[in-house]
Amino acid sequence: MTTRDELKSRGEEIQHRIDAMGSDADTAPGYQRMVSEALYGGLWARDGLPLTDRYICVLTGLMLNKNEAQLRRHIRGALKVGLSAREILEVFVQAGLYGGFPTAENAMSIAHEVFAAEGAEFDVEEDGNETLEEFMSMGQDLLANLHGERGTKGYADPANKTTGPLYT
């Protein structure tokens, strides 16, 4: 059985790695130990997901819940564990489809501030110069690659009057 001290030690190891050490002076007495034990030692230290994948989940949740101070801190941590600036922005683009474009834009603005402070650089690609026909063809190719034969059956069947038009 894992002791509280072992959880705390595992948690603090992760906190140091991602620069997330807190202070009770900033929160409440005993709070930081609880965070080290439960959050970082108990959850972040679990097997099953690498820290980079955990950060994709964390950044998404913080963005969707508009936790800007924590988002700023965790963008910095995501860079420290190896996510690139571009990958972080892509997390916000993807999550923005579910949480709204203004929410994604706020997260991207915070990310750019953190990138500037941390010296994180990324290439800006020109996007959106395709004609509508080229864009539609790209989407159909992606659908075929993702779904294979299923891309034209069931709900994606062009003959399906309800959902077929979404896929053609």
Question: What is each residue range found by the language model?
Answer:
Residues 54-62, 71, 75, 88-92:
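Short, structured motif recognition centered on aromatic/hydrophobic residues
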Residues 1-52, 65, 80, 104-168:
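Acidic, glycine/proline-rich low-complexity segments that act as flexible tails and inter-domain linkers
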Residues 50, 82-89:
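Helix N-cap / loop-to-helix initiation motif
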Residues 61-68, 99-100:
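Short alpha-helix boundary/capping elements
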Residues 94, 99-105:
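Substrate/cofactor-recognition hotspot
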Residues 88-93, 122-126:
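Short, charged low-complexity intrinsically disordered segments located at boundaries
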